[in-house]
Amino acid sequence: MKEKKIMALADENIMNTYRRVPIALVKGEGARLWDANGKEYLDFVAGIAVCNLGHSHPNVVKAIKKQAKNLMHVSNLYYTRPQGEVASILTKHSFADKVFFCNSGAEANEAAIKLARKYAHENLGEDKFELITMKDSFHGRTMATITATGQEKFQFGFTPLLDGFKYVPFNDPAALEDAITPKTCGIMLEPIQGEGGVIIPDDRYLAKVRDICDRHRILMIVDEV
């Protein structure tokens, strides 16, 4: 199919939620992409940081083929060997004791927000429901995650936002401490801000956030890809 026809088909049938670059990609190998006209590109986007192994990696293709021959999706109502094996690898190589599998960063953040409020309800009291997030942050495009996002440009057109969120400057432990109230249940932040313009905090900032959370018995939510 020619490039113009590919783009026309998409424009006619897919909701216009992205400002697309006018090229139609048809093939990838490693860090390289080709469009429908045969033009080659270097892929620095990596599916917005989710395809870091590149395109058509032989080991990835082999694993997908193997799994497709055995089982497709069966839901979390049942046990499967690969799910447990991957979870075990993740827990052994991270701080985590448990893993929650989901489909997107926004879904992960939604779950984290729910977990923070659930934790507070069961351990601190039902009046503790507020989350503190950072100005110039980005946490997703669902209702809860655009509310958590500290940028008005992502919230425009979707008000009223959800209750229970407040924003403080990134890399400012004093402002964070001042923002905590008897209703606070957690602090949510990116270790390095991306959408706000690659902002790296001071070396001790995250340790100070951890200390603040521990002292107030609230959860620290780290949004990292």
Residue ranges and their predicted role:
Residues M1-E29:
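Active-site-adjacent loop/helix segments that line or gate small-molecule/cofactor pockets in enzymes
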Residues A10, I14, Y18, A68, ...:
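Structural signal for hydrophobic packing residues in well-ordered secondary-structure cores
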Residues I23-D43:
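Active-site and channel-lining beta-strand-loop segments
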Residues K39, G186, L219-M220:
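Hydrophobic "anchor" residues on beta-strands that sit immediately upstream
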Residues E40-E126:
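Glycine-rich loop-to-alpha-helix module at the N-terminal edge of alpha/beta enzyme cores
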Residues A87-G186:
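PLP-dependent aspartate aminotransferase-fold enzymes
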Residues T181, I199-V225:
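Catalytic PLP-binding core of fold-type I/II PLP enzymes
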Residues T184-V198:
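Short acidic, glycine-rich surface-loop motifs adjacent to enzyme active sites
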